[in-house]
Amino acid sequence: MKRSKTLTLVEGAVMVALATVLSFIRIYKLPWGGSITLLSMLPIAVFSIKHGVAKGLGVAFVFSLVQFIQGITDGLFGWGLSPVMLVACIFIDYLAAYTVLGVAGMFRKKGAVGWIAGTMIAVFLRFVCHFLSGVVIWKSFGALSVSYTHLRAHETLANLV
């Protein structure tokens, strides 16, 4: 049976909704922003594995917009960032970091090993985005005395689940 575009669109919307609900289940809220959530990246990765990278990136981008809106309600604008740093934070910490989850399907035709490898690459790319954002933000505050090791530890915790 040939899959319709409408069915794929609805499935993507359901996965974004499920990922959003899971992102509200916070196991631990980190002191400098971010949190450990209950498998909130999994629905986006599953969609990307099932439908491919192109559609996965599209759904992941929609999820990034939802996460940005959630970040606004969590107090993103209360951080006291300069306008340039705020724009950098929005693009790196939200749009790029969540959109890269769509690459989880890059090895989808390789079976379970490919699914795991693609998901691990997606999570690593998300970590890189958050790490770069942390460097940019803390450098703008003049607080780069915070070591890169400490920053890596913070971002690693934020990307665990």
Name every feature range the model reports, one short phrase each.
Residues 98, 102, 123, 127-135:
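Mid-bilayer segments of alpha-helical transmembrane spans in multi-pass integral membrane proteins
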Residues 135-142:
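Membrane-helix interface motif
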Residues 1-59:
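Hydrophobic transmembrane alpha-helices
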Residues 22-36, 62-107, 138:
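Interfacial aromatic-anchored transmembrane helix boundaries in multi-pass membrane proteins
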Residues 149-156:
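Conserved small/polar residues in nucleotide/adenosyl-binding loops
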Residues 9-13, 57-61, 87-91, 116-120:
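Hydrophobic alpha-helical transmembrane segments
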